C-alpha cells in the first residue's frame, strides 16, 4: 500500500486519506476498496478533481457508487448533482460523517443548487418534517420544525414565529440575539409556557428576513411554506410530545407534496431515499406504533408474573393450562390478589377463561399446610370470606385444644390442660343444682339451637384469644383442683357456674368473652355476673344478660352468686381434700334454697347466659 501511494501526487494521496476516513463507517462500500484490492486499477479520482466527489461517495454507500467510480471520465456531473445534497447540513437525515468541511472549502458546493429565499422549495435531499402541537394558553395550533436540535415554532392563526429559537439555529450569541429582537416593532414576548414556545415572537416576514440573512432558510424548511398544514401527516416521526392535531389534519397525506421535489431532483433524491431511512426517520415509525399497541394489547398484570410462572414459557401471552398447576407453589400469595388478577385480565382469547383459573385457585383451601394451622382454619365473624368453605373434620380440630360439638353431649374427650382447668368444675355445679326434672330435658335443645351456628367460629377462637387474662388467670388459680374434688368426668378446675355439663354453652367463654348482648336491665348482682363491669364496688352498672323470661334460672344463677362475701366463701371452700366431698355438695345445694335479695324479674335461659365469663374476671381479679 505504501508503494502504491508513494509516486502519486499530494492531492491524490489526500483524496485517499479523506476517503479512508469517510469509508470507515461504511464497510460495505466497494468504491474506496478498489485502490487496495486491485493495484493495477487507476485511482478513483483524477488529481485535478476537487475533494467533493470523494466526500460525496461517503453519503451513498450503495452499489451506485461502484458504478460511478468506474466511470471516471465525467466526475463533474457527479459533483453538480450530488454535492449540493451533501453540503446541506441536515443533522436528522444525514450520517454524522465529518466530510462537509472538504466540500465547503472546495468552493463548489452551491453550483447545482439555487438558494430559495422564500423557503417554499425543499432543498435537495430534505424531507419535510413538521409537527404540530396545541398551544393551550394562546388557543392556537403551532407548527414545529427542528433544525440543529432547536425546535422553531410557528403559529397557525397569525403566522408569527419564535424569533428567539430562530436565531438560536443561526448560532447567534445571546447578547446579539436579544438586541435584534428588542429592536423589533411588532413582537410578542412569551415568558410562561413550554420551553420551545418561550421567547420573542416576531411576524412571519421578519422571521423570513432573518433566516435569509443568516442563511438558515433551507435548514428551517418547511417552516416558511405557505400551506404548511398540507405537510402534516400521521405523527410517526414525532418523538418529543403527544400530538394534539385533529384527526382530519392527521389524515392529510403527504404524498403529492413530498414527491414533487423528488421529480425535480431525481439523481440526488434517489440516493437520499435509499439513505435517509437508515439513521432516524424510519426508526421512529418503527417505535411509535409499538407503543400504541402496548397500550391496547392484553398484557398480563404485574403480579401475574409471580402468580403464574411465566419464565418457563415462550410467550407471556400463552396462558396454557399448565399455569394452574404452578399456582399453589407460590407461597406468599393470597386468594384476593389472585382473584383480582383474574378480574384484571381482559376477556380475550389471550387469557384463560375465568372458570379454569378459579379452579386452580381453589387448591389453597384444602391444603394441609394451611388448614393445620389455627390461623387459617377459622376466621373472626367480621371476615367471613376467609373462613373455610367446608366444615373441618374433628380430627384436625383436636390440635387446637377444642373438640367439635357432636350430636351427643357426653362423649367429648378431655381437652388440654389449660382449657380443662377453666371448665371442669362447672359440670358438677350444674348437674347438682339443676337436677330437677324438666330442666334437663328442654335445656340441651335450647342450647343446641342457639350455639350450633357459632361452632364454625368458636373453634378458632382459642387460637386468637389464648392470651385472654380471664382465661389465663382462671387456669392458674384453680389448676390445683382435681377431678376427684369436682366429681365431673369432663370439666375440671374452676368453680364458676355454667349451664349444665353440655359442651355447647362452655364454647362461649374460653376465648370468646364478649357474647351478644340483649337489652340492658338493672340488677344488684351486676358486679359479679357482668364481665364488663366498670366498677366492682357499686352495682349501678347494667346487667346485660338478665332479660329472659324464665325466672327459675335467674334465681338459681343470681342466688348462687349472692354477694361478694358469698363468692369468697365459695372460693375458700373449694380447695378441700377429696374426703370432704359431702360437705362441699351440701354447701353448693344450700345456695339453691336461699332466696336472692331482689333478683331480676326474668332470668336468662341457661343456654343464653354465659356466666362462665362473669366468674372468670372476678376470680382472676382477686
UniProtKB/Swiss-Prot annotation:
Q: Enumerate the SMART domains for this protein.
A: KilA-N
* Gene Ontology molecular function: DNA-binding transcription factor activity; sequence-specific DNA binding
Knockout phenotype, as recorded, reads: Leads to defective conidiophore morphology and impairs conidia production. Affects cell wall beta-1,3-glucan biosynthesis.
Where does the HTH APSES-type domain start and stop, copy by copy? Answer: 129-235
Q: Quick check: keyword Transcription regulation in the entry?
A: yes
Region of interest: Nuclear localization domain = 565-590
Q: Which UniProt keywords are listed?
A: Conidiation, DNA-binding, Nucleus, Sporulation, Transcription, Transcription regulation
Quick one: a GO biological-process term for this protein? sporulation resulting in formation of a cellular spore
Which Pfam families does this one have? KilA-N
**Stretch list, region Disordered:** 1-24, 62-81, 239-517, 549-622
Query: What domain of life does the native source organism fall in?
Result: Eukaryota
List cellular component terms (GO).
nucleus
User: Where is this chain compositionally biased, Polar residues type?
Assistant: 274-283, 302-345, 355-370, 404-421, 455-470, 480-506, 549-563
Where found, per UniProt? Answer: Nucleus
Q: Which PROSITE patterns match?
A: HTH_APSES
Keyword DNA-binding present in the record's keywords: the answer is yes
Annotated Gene3D superfamilies = Transcription regulator HTH, APSES-type DNA-binding domain (3.10.260.10)
DNA-binding stretch(es), residue numbering of this chain: 163-184
TM segment ranges: none
Q: What induces it?
A: Expression is increased 50-fold during the establishment of developmental competence. Expression is positively controlled by brlA. Expression is also regulated by the LAMMER kinase lkhA.
Q: Locations of Basic and acidic residues compositional bias?
A: 566-586
Primary role: Transcription factor that regulates asexual reproduction. Binds the StuA-response elements (StRE) with the consensus sequence 5'-(A/T)CGCG(T/A)N(A/C)-3' at the promoters of target genes. Required from the very earliest events of asexual reproduction until completion of conidiophore development, but is not specifically required for differentiation of conidia. Represses transcription of the abaA developmental regulatory gene and of the developmentally regulated awh11 gene. Controls the expression of the catalase-peroxidase gene cpeA.
Q: What family is it from?
A: Belongs to the EFG1/PHD1/stuA family.
User: What PANTHER family does this protein's entry cite?
Assistant: PROTEIN SOK2-RELATED (PTHR47792:SF1)
Q: How is this protein named in the record?
A: Cell pattern formation-associated protein stuA
Q: Which organism is it from?
A: Emericella nidulans (strain FGSC A4 / ATCC 38163 / CBS 112.46 / NRRL 194 / M139) (Aspergillus nidulans)
Q: In the UniProt record, what gene is named as encoding this protein?
A: stuA
